[in-house]
Structure formats: C-alpha cells, structure tokens
C-alpha cells in the first residue's frame, strides 16, 4: 500500500473525475497490484462524492485507505467492497445515509441529493460490479465514471437506466438529513 501511495501521489488528479476509469490520468493509479482502469470505481465514486460535499479529497490517500481497509482480494484484482465505503466515511467524519434499494437511490436524486450507487452488472454475484457517483445538475441527472471508457460525465434519465434487467443493486449512499442544502 505504501508503494502504491508513493506512485499514486505522483499522478495529478484535478477536479471531479467524470470520465471513465480507463482514461488518463486516473487509469494509471494503482489499487493493490491492479491499475485503476479495471478496479478503481469505488475509490472514484467516493472521491467525487467527497468533492461534491466540499471536502478536498486526496486521491492517493483515498486509494491507500481503500487498499488497507476495503479490498475484496488482497491483490486488488477484484476492486474494493462497496459496502465498506461507510466505514471509510465514518472514519473521516463524513455524514451519510446507506440504502439497499434502487428506489431509494432514485428518490434521493429526485430530492436533489448526490448518490453513490453500486450494482452487479449481471444476474449473479460473479458478474462483476460497478460503482458510480450521480447527481442532478440544473435539472439533469449526471453519472460520473458511468462506464469505463466514458469521455466525460454521462447524462441519464434515471438511476434505473444505469442497470439492465439483469443487474442486482448492492448498496448506495447519500447525504444524511443534517447535510441538506
């Protein structure tokens, strides 16, 4: 983790990461023995959420924290566990509300709240997962890192549009009521 932290510290990430994780410079960050290009979505979603909430997250430090506390496989090849985002937020003193249904994610964005959404891409738990940050901006819903090769944030009609009929919702996060704007 310390070696990756030193490597990641040398990669400058500015502003929100709206583009997909296969794009530079974020694709070259490391998580375990894996490049972010295939496994960094939870870290990117948490980074964007923190940025939106007014924090100044350090991507290298955030990746280090995920590597130490949230990897599914020790080598990072399976990314990180989206259910562990809550523990990282708690340790950082970040307020959040966790939910387990896509309807709750949709309701949160309709209320103007930012969300982190994690879901299985297919019908079984071995199909791979993706985790994204989504927020309404000027009445339009945008997803950051919507898919790995996205050139920028992606406009969608709803959270439901992210998932196909075979997708399984895993977990989501939004602001707790004390964070309302």
Protein language model features and the residues they cover:
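Surface-exposed charge patches in extracellular/virion surface proteins
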Residues: 1, 9, 140, 180-181
């Amino acid at each position: 983790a310390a070696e990756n932290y030193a490597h990641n510290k040398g990669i400058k990430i500015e502003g929100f990461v709206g583009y997909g994780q296969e794009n530079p410079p974020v694709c070259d960050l490391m998580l375990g023995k894996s490049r972010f290009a295939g496994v960094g979505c939870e870290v990117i979603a948490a980074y964007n959420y923190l940025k939106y909430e007014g924090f100044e997250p350090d991507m290298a430090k955030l990746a280090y924290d995920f590597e130490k506390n949230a990897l599914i496989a020790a080598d990072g090849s399976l990314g990180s566990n989206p259910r562990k985002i809550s523990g990282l937020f708690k340790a950082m003193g970040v307020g959040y509300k966790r939910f387990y249904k896509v309807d709750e994610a949709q309701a949160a964005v309709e209320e103007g709240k930012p969300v982190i959404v994690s879901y299985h891409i297919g019908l079984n738990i071995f199909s791979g997962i993706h985790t994204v940050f989504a927020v309404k901006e000027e009445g339009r819903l945008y997803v950051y890192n919507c898919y790995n090769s996205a050139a920028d944030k992606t406009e969608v009609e709803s959270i439901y549009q992210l998932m196909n009929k075979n997708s399984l919702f895993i977990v989501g996060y939004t602001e707790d009521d004390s964070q309302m704007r």
